Regions:
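Membrane-embedded beta-strand positions of outer-membrane beta-barrel proteins
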Residues: 24-28, 48-50, 92-94, 141-143, ...
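Hydrophobic, lipid-facing positions within transmembrane beta-strands of outer-membrane proteins
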Residues: 9, 22, 31-35, 73-79, ...
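Repeated loop/turn-to-beta-strand initiation elements of outer-membrane beta-barrel proteins
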Residues: 43-46, 56, 87-90, 135-139, ...
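Residue-level signature of outer-membrane beta-barrel architecture
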Residues: 15, 39, 82-85, 131, ...
Length: 237
């Protein structure tokens, strides 16, 4: 009942509470590398990492049948911040990635070859707070935001996609006993999508907005060590 939309946009309210220890990681590969570091303080911690991959050195040594205008290149990074409070925990996560390449492939029907290019730029951010607000009562709140941009080039046909998505969620859970707990929550999905198509002879733009509000109630009932029941109901509009 808690997760709707066929789990296509799940905002998980359960993640790692705290890193185990401070650490620095360095990865070296033939086509790139990465670095990451985790720092801990009394009530806070911060983890960051980044990676970079490029096929340019590989293609300079090993030629293939494609004419690379821009060899495959990808860069990504993420950061996680955690803050402990007296009765709760706040987490903030953000990540980005960028992919870019362009090539001309051989084609028996096109003497000059078929040009294909792709650029992806994505940014994702979420935050979550979980804490105790009463006797056996806990509060979970979360929000996420995504920006995804894609540029595709096939010969003289150019397609540009832009998607902005937001997800807001709040859940209250009450533990009545070791055998019964009840969760009540609500969430909001907001999505905007735009696509532009163009070539020397034609151009068009289209898109959509999708807003969904959901409510759910879910219970966990333990009858014995071997038998338990999870039941719930969900409504969306």
């Amino acid at each position: 009942a808690e997760y709707g939309q066929a789990l296509s946009s799940v905002l998980l309210l359960s993640t790692i509470d705290e890193p185990m220890q401070e650490a620095t990681n360095i990865n070296i590969m033939s086509a790139g590398g990465g670095i990451g570091h985790t720092e801990k303080w009394d009530t806070t911690s911060l983890s960051v990492n980044a990676s970079y991959i490029t096929l340019a050195p590989y293609l300079a040594i090993f030629n293939d049948r494609n004419d690379w205008e821009k060899p495959f290149e990808a860069v990504s990074g993420e950061a996680v911040f955690r803050k402990k409070f007296k009765n709760g925990l706040f987490k903030f996560y953000t990540a980005f990635d960028r992919t870019n390449f362009e090539l001309t492939q051989e084609d028996i029907n096109v003497p000059t070859g078929v040009t294909f290019g792709l650029k992806n730029r994505n940014v994702y951010t979420n935050m979550r707070y979980s804490g105790v607000i009463g006797d056996g009562l806990t509060l979970d709140t979360g929000a996420s935001y995504t920006v995804a941009k894609t540029d595709v080039l096939v010969q003289e046909n150019a397609i540009q996609d832009t998607e902005n998505s937001a997800h807001l969620k709040v859940k209250v859970k009450k533990r009545f006993s070791s055998r019964f707990k009840l969760s009540i929550g609500a969430e909001q999905f907001l999505t905007t999508f735009e696509e532009d198509f163009s070539n020397p002879f034609f151009a068009d733009s289209y898109g959509f907005n999708n807003h969904i509000t959901g409510f759910f109630v879910e219970s966990d009932i333990v009858f014995s060590r071997k038998f338990a029941l999870k039941a719930g109901i969900r409504s969306e509009y």
